[in-house]
């Protein structure tokens, strides 16, 4: 179970990091090179997600969505210095429970 978690985290870092660089370029006036690097990192995210050991594309991306939410809240705390409120935390917990329901049961 460690390998899928590692892939989810690596994919999340690429998606959030790449998206943030594009945000900086288009919304904060950073140079276009920042945006190009962000785009390249986002492309890498798409490749990394294919390394998951789960056979179903839809299930992998649905489960990853829950992980992405948690990582986005952590990113907001660390980078943007914006603390999640109780509704953010409750929603994130619900998402992680959903991820576990999707991924943990063995299927025939």
From Swiss-Prot:
Keywords assigned by UniProt, alphabetized: Cell membrane, Membrane, Transmembrane, Transmembrane helix
Localization annotation: Cell membrane
Main subcellular location: membrane
Coiled coil: none
SUPFAM superfamilies: Multidrug resistance efflux transporter EmrE (SSF103481)
Keyword Isomerase included in the entry's annotation: no
CC per GO annotation: plasma membrane
Regions crossing the membrane: 5-25, 31-51, 60-80, 86-106
Membrane topology term: Multi-pass membrane protein
Domain of life: Bacteria
Database matches in HAMAP family: UPF0060 (MF_00010)
NCBIfam families the record matches: PRK02237.1 (NF002586)
Annotated family: Belongs to the UPF0060 family.
Protein name: UPF0060 membrane protein SAB2216c
């Amino acid at each position: 179970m460690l390998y899928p978690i590692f892939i989810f985290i690596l994919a999340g870092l690429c998606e959030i990091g790449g998206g943030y660089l594009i945000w900086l370029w288009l919304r904060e006036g950073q140079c276009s090179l920042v945006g190009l690097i962000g785009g390249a990192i986002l492309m890498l995210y798409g490749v990394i997600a294919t390394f998951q050991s789960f056979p179903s594309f839809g299930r992998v991306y649905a489960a990853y969505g829950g992980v992405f939410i948690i990582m986005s809240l952590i990113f907001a705390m660390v980078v943007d210095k914006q603390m999640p409120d109780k509704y953010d935390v409750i929603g994130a917990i619900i998402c992680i429970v959903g991820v576990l329901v999707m991924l943990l049961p063995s299927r025939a």
